[in-house]
Amino acid sequence: SAASDVYKRQIKDWDSRWYARDEKVGDLIVEDNKIRKFVKKSLYGAGVPKIEIERSNDVVTLFVHCARPGMVIGKDGAEVEKLRLAVEALIGKKVKLNIVEVRNPDMNAQLVAENIAQQLEKRISHRRAMKNAMGRAMRAGAKGIKCCCSGRLGGREIAGVEHYHEGTIPLQ
């Protein structure tokens, strides 16, 4: 139940850090969403769990957290520059792009989930994909992990849900 969950604001920070007049907030939230979708799609293979956005008067600063920064930056920062120009073209504002490395990708829930999804796209068995991901997370030092896959698993006609868990998962 929600009552037994940890209060999220104590353990997580906002992904958008800016303040605006009331009439602009809606447009800026939509713009943030557009930026996130575009960057996530552009860097699909690089493992991007989180994109933080800060705004000052006329500059939008993006902090792109990624598992494989070399792939994002490219040779002499060419790929980063290409991405920055593409985002500038998308929103029509000046953009600063900072790449932040994710220290331990096997401990990041978003990256573990995306990794399982990529394996399912390659037609690997859902059981094996989940067990492999859970094993890697536990070896990386996680105290516990719970994993769930749902849908037409293995091409079945009737959709189902499969759960696996390992270690301790107190109160979420």
How would you name each of these model-derived features?
Residues V59, P69-V72, G135, G144, ...:
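Short beta-strands and strand-coil junctions in structured, solvent-facing domains, enriched
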